[in-house]
Amino acid sequence: SHKEYRKTLSELRRRINIVERLMSENRWDEIEFDKIPSRAGFIYKNAFARRDIIAKKYEKFAKDTTKSVNASVLYPYEVVAKAVKGCDYWGNSSMSDVDRAMINKYWANLPDYLNGKDCSMMCVVDTSGSMTGSEASAPMNVAISLGMYCAERIGGPFQSLY
């Protein structure tokens, strides 16, 4: 029945310590940032920063270079969209140091979409006005992220050339 399904689901969520459950029960201090799903980390970052009980822990985690985040279900364009959102037309950033550190963590922990292949390629990125859009998946965000991702992760003569 529907009632049994909801009870089973609730029990399973309790056992795996799902972040939304901890948040709704005001158990903020029990949240472990290196264990939460990547999408949840993206969605709830403002909630973490607003709560005094966890804001300092979140800031410490963001600045700790030895700890990583789960970015297994994020695409590069989603990370770029968050970074671009914090900048104005001239590239001036209104982003906090904590947000910048977390975006860098997500970028560094993106999956290997190139499957470890060492190829000789160069990405040419179109950033003309026709590439703009209002969503995270705007063509410009996709193009920039693809160019950056490939330039950082490929080998060969074009590695790290932007």
Language-model regions, residue ranges each:
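Long lumenal/extracellular ectodomains of secretory and single-pass membrane proteins
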Residues: 1-142, 152-162
